[in-house]
Design a protein with these regions (language model features):
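Conserved beta-strand in the GNAT
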Residues: 74, 95-106, 111-118
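Active-site rim helix/loop that mediates acceptor-substrate recognition in acyltransferases
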Residues: 48-82
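C-terminal "cap" of GNAT-fold acetyltransferases
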Residues: 171-210
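Conserved acetyl-CoA-binding loop-helix of GNAT-fold acetyltransferases
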Residues: 125-138, 150
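Conserved beta-hairpin
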Residues: 71-100
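A short, internal acetyl-CoA/4′-phosphopantetheine-binding micro-motif in the GNAT/acyltransferase core
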Residues: 117-124, 153
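A short beta-loop-alpha structural element at the N-terminal edge
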Residues: 30-44
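Conserved active-site alpha-helix within GNAT-family acetyltransferase domains
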Residues: 142, 146, 152-180
Length: 210
């Protein structure tokens, strides 16, 4: 196992469950997973930027992150902890900084999508990405969801967490008709609609059954 998480549950002023997890990486790093806040948006955008430039993740405007911020969790590196800049004996960051993120977007009463999973380049291979994904899956279970979808180039990574490739549209016609009312590109990718295929070439459509 690449990381260990110890969770405590609290409540944000909005009533949204505030899950906090301490994550220990294979490099000895310690980071905190927590719900994202509006103040994290620019850090999230900066994490995603190099992935979007390589077309691994979809580029988004800042306003999109603000609109969806309640779907995100972030991994925060705490001053004095090992991690990027500190795990190899170098200086730890002077202030907390965001070194990972991921989002869970609900698409139907039994279905959600993992979106925008990204980690700082220095944190790749430490188990942080897996820890974020496991936390998003845990949130899906808590909400009573039965399936989690992802659109990804990283098929081996998601496959290691139980996701399997899918073909076609794994919903009935009534649900399909309702989903067509949405303008969301992620939902269109789940439905395998032609309008998003130019932007998803090479991606695998994968599904996890909970």
């Amino acid at each position: 196992m690449n990381s260990t998480a110890v969770r405590t549950d609290e409540h944000l002023p909005t009533g949204r469950a505030a899950r906090r997890a301490e994550v220990y990486g294979v490099d000895g790093s310690r980071r905190i997973l927590r719900p994202a806040r509006p103040a994290d948006v620019r850090a999230i955008a900066e994490l995603v930027r190099p992935y979007a430039e390589r077309r691994v993740l979809i580029a988004k405007d800042l306003i999109s992150y603000f609109e969806d911020i309640q779907e995100f969790i972030v991994a925060e590196e705490i001053p004095g902890d090992a991690g990027p800049g500190g795990a190899d004996g170098g200086e730890a960051p002077a202030e907390p900084r965001i070194v990972g993120c991921g989002a869970l977007h609900v698409m139907w009463d039994d279905l959600a999508e993992v979106r925008t999973l990204a980690v700082h380049p220095d944190a790749v291979g430490t188990g942080l990405g897996s820890a974020i994904l496991r936390e998003l899956i845990a949130q899906a279970r808590e909400m009573g969801l039965k399936r989690v979808f992802c659109l990804t180039f990283e098929e081996p990574f998601f496959g290691a967490h139980g996701f399997v490739p899918i073909e076609g549209t794994p919903v009935g016609m009534d649900v399909f008709a309702e989903m067509l009312r949405s303008h969301d590109d992620g939902l269109a990718a789940f439905l395998d609609l032609a309008r998003v295929k130019p932007n998803t070439l090479g991606n695998a459509r994968m599904l996890l059954h909970l």
